[in-house]
Every structure is written in C-alpha cells, then in structure tokens.
Amino acid sequence: MKIKEKIVLAYSGGLDTSVIVKWLQNELNFEVITFTADLGQGEEILLAKKKAKLLNIKNIFVKNLKKEFIKNFVFPFLRSSSTYENNYLLGTAIARPLIVKELMKISYYLNTNYVSHGATGKGNDQIRFELGFKYFNPKIKIIAPWRIWNLNSRNSLLNFCIKNNIKFDSKTKKYSIDKNLFHNSYEGGNLDNINYEPDEPMWEHTLSNYNSLDYPIYISLTFKNGDPIKINNKNYNVEELFLKLNNLGSIAGIGRLDIIENRLIGIKSRGCYESPGASIIMYARKKLESLILDKEIYSFKEEIALKYSKLVYNGYWWSPERILLQKIIDYTQTSINGIIKLKIFKGQINIASINSINSLFNSKNSSFDEISNLFNQSDSSGFINIKSLRLII
C-alpha cells in the first residue's frame, strides 16, 4: 500500500478550508495536517480545533501567536507610518507572514514536501502565502485548491459538504470576514455593490458615531523608541495594551474604513475595515514624530513609507528591501520617546497635550511675538533670493 504524502494546511476552521481538508484527503490522497494561528480571533480558534477533529485530522497544530504578532509584526509595521493607498492599515497583509513562518516550522519538523492554503485565485493572500512558503523552502510544493478544483461557488462547496458528511453552518454569511488583534475586515457579499451602504450589524468591533459614547475619553500614551508602552501611566504587555486600546477606540467609534483598493493582480475590490487600537497608535506616534524628527528625516520617512506599504501589501515582508527599510525606520524611532494625551470622541482623535525630552519645537523660535537669537530675520532675504533662482532662470 502506497504511503500517503503529508501536507500542512493553513486552516481557519471556515467553510473553505474545511472543504479543502476533505478534498485533499479524497481527491489527492494526502494525509492532512492542520495549522491554526491564534492571532486574536477569539472563540473561532476553539471551533477550528473542534472542526479539525471532526474531519479526522490526526495532527492538529494550534499556536497562540498574539504577543509575537503585536511585538514582531504589528509594532514594526506601525513604526513605518505606512498605509496602503493612503487608507488601509494592512491588518490582513501583516498577519500572513507570521502564519507562514509558523506553518513552515511544522513542515520542516514533520519533513513534509507539500503545503496548502485556502486563498482564492483572485485575491492577494495567495501571493502572500506562496512568496513566504518559497522564502522558507524554495523546494516546497504548493497546492492551491481554488486554482485547481471545480468548486467555484458557495453552493458547490455546500453540496460537497453534504456529499462528504462535513458539518457546516447552513446560515449564509453576508461577508467574508478576517479577524485578528489588529483589525476586522469584511469583503464580498453585498459589499461588491459599491452603492450598498454597510448595515450596522456588520461592524462587529466598533460603534458608529451615533451609538458611540456621548462624552470624550482622554488617553495618555507613553512611547519608547516608537512603540507605546503605557496607557495612562500604567504598564501593559503588548497584547494587553493592544486589547485595551481596541476596547477604548471601539466605544469611541474610532477606526472604521470603507474603501476601494487596487489588488496586486490589478482588480479593484471593496473592503471594510475596523482598526480602533491601531488607528490610535498610528495617530499618536505620527504626532510625536512631527514634534521630534528633523524636517528632512521626517520627509524621507514619508517617502519610504509608500514603498514599505506596497511591499507589505504585495507579500514581500521577507524581502531584503523590506528588511533594509525596517532598519532605516527603526533608526528614526530611537528618539520617538514621550507622552501624548489624546481626546477620542465620536470617531475623532485629537491632541490634548504632547511632551518629549527629544522635542525640536521651541516656541521662542517659532513665535511671532518673541525675538529669537537663533538667526537674524534679515538673513531670510538672501535665502529667498537663492531659492528663487530656478524660477527666474
């Protein structure tokens, strides 16, 4: 009897990856090993483990990666001040490299030649997964079911479940949802109609401005080397800190986004996102940067943030250029130390106060009402004459 090949599947516990398990077993005769990364999905993790057992999986791997996710992926990303196309905080894209890293550890440990994922042939995740797989093992063989099988609709997936005795939730989900500590994302379903306004129940993580608190919340954040370390002068570990800011931002209506984005393969898609904690951190740290960083460093960092965001979105987290940019970014953050007090209210974030020992702001130098010894104002005439040369010639 031929020994079955082993394959490690990135398993979420959802309909798609549950069908993939049985399809890999029945159609390709694989021994399937599942890996589920706990990045803050809550009860979905326990459900995924339970479903894997029902699918007769012998080797089920589940790992709590929440702290590593925030410390080694989210915080380095937030230091970059990057947003994709000036909007999206990349909560899905930033999670995929960690999932891949841990999955490939299992593949190496069990000496498997194959790995698999549940990303479709239209989206970005197929690229993010597979670039990572090849980075860790250039010889690995990848099975991407959505690019192979003929199960091309939800109905065909449900019929496959019935035929193969796979238990599933018969209640149709309106959207494709991805969750982690960083964000919630919603795609597909009614959102494919760009004139459809999302219904309020869709937003699981934040309150609307109408339903959010009727009074402002004041938050004091302490930063060290570009990362938040305290809330209201109280220390938290990275996971606790992010959860706390998520909760505070949620009840204040912070971090909702409804956008049209350009996928890597060229298709435009609509996505709705909730990132309350990340939005607060990004705002606060950028305000500290404006206070502390030299003008040219600040400008240069904004330029490389554009490149950085594209690399992360397009699946190049492990690329040498992303790693190089990270070193430059982290160097700029050594002086980003201070305390900023924020007022969050009805979806808005504003500064209440800001202080840093590394501040370059001097009220005497910038004030119209005080005389500064830093330079003679009459020197500006020569400066302007030089600057105007290219407009005169």
UniProtKB/Swiss-Prot annotation:
Give the catalysed reaction(s), semicolon-separated.
L-citrulline + L-aspartate + ATP = 2-(N(omega)-L-arginino)succinate + AMP + diphosphate + H(+)
Origin, by domain of life?
Answer: Bacteria
Q: Where does ATP bind?
A: 10-18, 37, 118
Q: Where in the cell is it found?
A: Cytoplasm
Metabolic or biological pathway: Amino-acid biosynthesis; L-arginine biosynthesis; L-arginine from L-ornithine and carbamoyl phosphate: step 2/3
EC numbers for this chain: 6.3.4.5
One cellular-component annotation, GO: cytoplasm
NCBIfam families referenced in this protein's UniProt entry, alphabetically: argG (TIGR00032), PRK00509.1 (NF001770)
Q: Mind telling me what this protein is named?
A: Argininosuccinate synthase
What is this protein's gene name?
Answer: argG
